[in-house]
């Protein structure tokens, strides 16, 4: 009896000590939240989580509460970023001279990224908009098979299914021609790829495969594992580059069990042969990302970067070869249709549907002499740069703002920019997919629809699949295009890349693309939206409280 009494006292004492310890840890974390979190909405959300979810809230904050990419990775990344700036500065380019044809507001917008990244506006680019997977695969394959010296690929998701297999085989064939091929993929986004036989196959064929931001039990303790490399970049011979929303996936196979339809993506092919251009800036971004993942000594980091960029400083002549590229695509398409091999010695399975490719080539011809600016963003390195650029662009709008995004979870500043633009008489259109692959994001996004509709923002829900494109067009001469979603994860956590396009013709093409999406969407009516049930509204608004953490 005495032993039972003593054990009861011990249990009570342990429980009291546990409660006191939990309170002290929670209090300590609240102090850290107040000190570390610069955004008020995030701080309030985390404090609510800490008190509402005992123990779980503490574990959650320890794992995901603060931006931490790891000391060694941050050190390597900062050194790589310095090399990126040094490259831009070494060219001694007068960006004011290059951007002299831009209006004052566009020049001011470009200065935001120039200050953060060192990359300004470059001219003499030829851009080709691609809006379906057939065209994107055909163009990438053509450039892989034509590459002479270097191929750099950086993607969030690599899914070795369908037409992606043909692309991976083309990479292996390229190394046999003496081409240096590097593939950098995110550890989480490409989880299935890194556990497949394709990594060994590629490495055996002398393709360099790099895992970006690898995760593991120990890494979970020392850094945040939800900071991901969300970039999508492809560079060939320092003259041809791609970026956009497209991952290395075949939409006929990818996430078919999610019941959201096929993923709808866009990509832009950029071509330039100038000594300094945005394609070489793309190559530098991917090269620095690769070098940040290596275990080489810090003193050798510059050598690693220079190994990829040694040809950046050679003089070259600007030649617009976009028409030759299109003729090459058409020639290969016709050869496949005739059962011929357009490139002897390379196996080309007849996987492409030619008709959509030809119609898209006619719909979106290449646009030459385009001025554009590459804007890479990453936590603790160039954080907030794309967010600041985007919000300022919306505030500067005079006629229209058209947004296409798969995920829309704004903060107060972005919401204010959109609602005040609509109240100023600017036509503001937001197009999001009706179905997304994240229920939490869907509910959080819906919570913002009512204030947007009340302000006069037009909202459309895309019906023909998961609209994954990320496009912002302002008026008729400025466009932001790339990998950035309209949510805080893209703005503050992920490694992203965007292009600011300063060209009326190219912006008109982007607007045409966006209006094609709108034709496949249903408008959201304010009256009908307000008549939803109390339960539906409550659920959206409850999830909205945690939107700063999504």
Model-derived segments and their meaning:
Residues 1-388, 392, 396, 436, ...:
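N-terminal localization/anchoring segments of enzymes in phospholipid and broader phosphate metabolism
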Residues 185, 405, 432:
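Short beta-strand/turn micro-motifs composed of small residues
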Residues 417-421, 447, 515-516:
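Short, solvent-exposed amphipathic alpha-helical segments in soluble enzyme
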Residues 407-426, 433, 438:
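Helical hairpin unit composed of two closely spaced alpha helices linked by a short loop
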Residues 472-474:
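Conserved, well-ordered active-site substructure
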Residues 177-179, 424-427:
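A short helix->loop->beta-strand "cap" motif at the edges of active sites that frequently abuts
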């Amino acid at each position: 009896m005495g032993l039972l009494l003593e054990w009861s006292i011990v249990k009570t004492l342990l429980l009291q000590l546990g409660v006191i310890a939990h309170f002290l840890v929670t209090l300590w974390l609240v102090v850290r939240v107040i000190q570390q979190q610069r955004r008020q909405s995030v701080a309030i959300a985390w404090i609510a989580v800490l008190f509402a979810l005992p123990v779980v809230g503490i574990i959650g904050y320890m794992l995901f509460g603060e931006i931490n990419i790891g000391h060694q990775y941050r050190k390597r990344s900062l050194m790589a970023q310095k090399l990126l700036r040094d490259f831009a500065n070494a060219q001694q380019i007068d960006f004011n001279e290059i951007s002299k044809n831009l209006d004052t507001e566009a020049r001011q917008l470009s200065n935001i990224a120039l200050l953060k990244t060192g990359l300004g506006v470059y001219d003499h680019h030829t851009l080709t908009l691609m809006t379906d997977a057939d065209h994107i695969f055909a163009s990438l394959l053509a450039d892989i098979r034509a590459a002479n010296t270097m191929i750099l690929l950086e993607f969030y998701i690599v899914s070795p299914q369908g037409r992606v297999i043909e692309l991976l085989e083309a990479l292996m064939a390229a190394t046999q021609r003496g081409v240096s091929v590097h593939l950098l993929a995110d550890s989480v986004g490409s989880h299935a790829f890194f556990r497949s036989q394709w990594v060994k196959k590629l490495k055996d064929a002398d393709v360099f495969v790099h895992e970006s931001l690898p995760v593991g039990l120990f890494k979970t303790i020392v850094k945040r594992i939800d900071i991901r490399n969300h970039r999508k970049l492809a560079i060939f011979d320092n003259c041809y580059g791609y970026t956009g929303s497209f991952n290395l996936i075949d939409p006929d196979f990818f996430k078919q069990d999610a019941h959201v339809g096929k993923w709808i993506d866009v990509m832009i092919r950029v071509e330039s042969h100038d000594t300094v251009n945005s394609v070489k800036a793309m190559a530098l971004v991917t090269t620095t990302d690769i070098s940040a993942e290596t275990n080489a000594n810090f003193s050798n980091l510059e050598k690693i970067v220079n190994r990829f960029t040694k040809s950046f400083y050679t003089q070259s002549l600007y030649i617009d070869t976009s028409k030759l590229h299109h003729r090459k695509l058409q020639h290969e398409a016709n050869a496949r249709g005739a059962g011929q091999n357009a490139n002897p010695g390379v196996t080309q399975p007849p996987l492409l549907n030619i008709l959509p490719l030809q119609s898209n080539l006619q719909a979106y011809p290449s646009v030459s002499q385009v001025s554009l600016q590459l804007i890479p963003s990453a936590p603790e390195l160039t954080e907030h740069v794309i967010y600041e650029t985007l919000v300022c662009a919306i505030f500067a709008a005079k006629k229209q703002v058209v947004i296409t995004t798969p995920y829309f979870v704004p903060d107060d500043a972005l919401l204010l920019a959109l609602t005040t633009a609509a109240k100023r008489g600017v036509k503001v259109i937001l197009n999001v997919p009706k179905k997304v692959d994240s229920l939490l994001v869907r509910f959080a996004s819906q919570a913002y629809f009512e204030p947007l509709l009340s302000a006069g923002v037009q909202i459309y829900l895309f019906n023909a699949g998961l609209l994954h494109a990320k496009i912002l067009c302002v008026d008729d001469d400025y466009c932001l295009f790339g990998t950035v979603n309209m949510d805080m994860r893209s703005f503050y956590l992920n490694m992203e890349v965007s292009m600011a396009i300063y060209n009326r013709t190219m912006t008109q093409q982007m607007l045409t693309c966006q209006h094609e999406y709108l034709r496949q969407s249903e408008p959201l009516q304010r009256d009908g939206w307000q008549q939803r049930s109390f339960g539906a509204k409550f659920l959206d608004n409850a999830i909205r409280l945690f939107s700063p953490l999504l």
